[in-house]
Curated annotation (Swiss-Prot):
One of its GO terms (cellular component) is plasma membrane. It comes from the Eukaryota. Belongs to the Casparian strip membrane proteins (CASP) family. It is found in: Cell membrane. InterPro entries: CASP_dom, CASPL-5. Residues 1-48, 98-121, 182-185 are cytoplasmic. It comes from Pinus contorta (Shore pine). Pfam families: CASP_dom. Keywords: Cell membrane, Membrane, Transmembrane, Transmembrane helix. The keyword Membrane applies. It is a multi-pass membrane protein. This is CASP-like protein 5A1.
Length: 185
């Protein structure tokens, strides 16, 4: 019989097979996993949802600030805009998955699904960090080296860059915790 397996699994400890007692080693492992993952912002948890919403909001603010600037022809700023759009889409998609997992009371413990989360978080974190660093370098050049902040909205650039770094920081936390979860599956 061909039956598909769900990507989300029930939350909780599975019962012992065949009415047999769970060996002490297994009980200790289950307790350790419960203690390690309880309250951590992992995929499918309320903390994970809050982390994803924080990533989304900070990337959205960075995007909104960059869009509100009339003229930005520097490549680093265009890259920041593209990276924040990608970050918004990725964080929003995973927030929707977290909401679904919370509504159906399921845990996202599938190794394939978690590995996709890890790779996606790693890629978006790298892109967001690179874009924020490149944009910060351009703002330092404009503001400090050639003193052109009077004709350029440096404060808006700085606000967008700060929000991009905040988004990167939250994605990095998510990446590390999800990678740790993948290593323990």
């Amino acid at each position: 019989m061909n039956v598909s397996h769900p990507a989300v699994h029930p939350v909780g400890v599975p019962p012992a097979l065949g009415g047999q007692a769970v060996p002490p080693r297994m009980r200790m492992r289950v307790r350790m996993e419960y203690l390690v993952f309880q309250g951590m912002p992992l995929p499918g948890s309320l903390g994970g949802l809050m982390l994803r919403l924080g990533q989304f909001c900070s990337a959205l603010i960075a995007f909104s600030v960059m869009v509100s600037i009339r003229d930005f022809s520097v490549t680093a700023f265009c890259y920041l805009l593209a990276a924040t759009v990608l970050q918004c889409l990725w964080s929003l998609a995973l927030a929707v998955i977290d909401v679904y997992a919370l509504l159906v009371k399921r845990s996202l413990r599938n190794p394939l699904l978690v590995s996709i989360f890890v790779v996606g978080d790693g890629v978006t974190a790298t892109l967001t960090f690179a874009a924020a660093c490149a944009s910060a370098g351009v703002v330092v050049l404009i503001g400090n080296d050639i003193s052109m902040c009077k004709s350029n909205p440096c404060a808006n650039y700085e606000a967008a860059i700060i929000m991009a770094f905040l988004s990167w920081f939250m994605v990095s936390i998510s990446f590390v915790l999800t990678f740790w979860m993948l290593a323990t599956l």
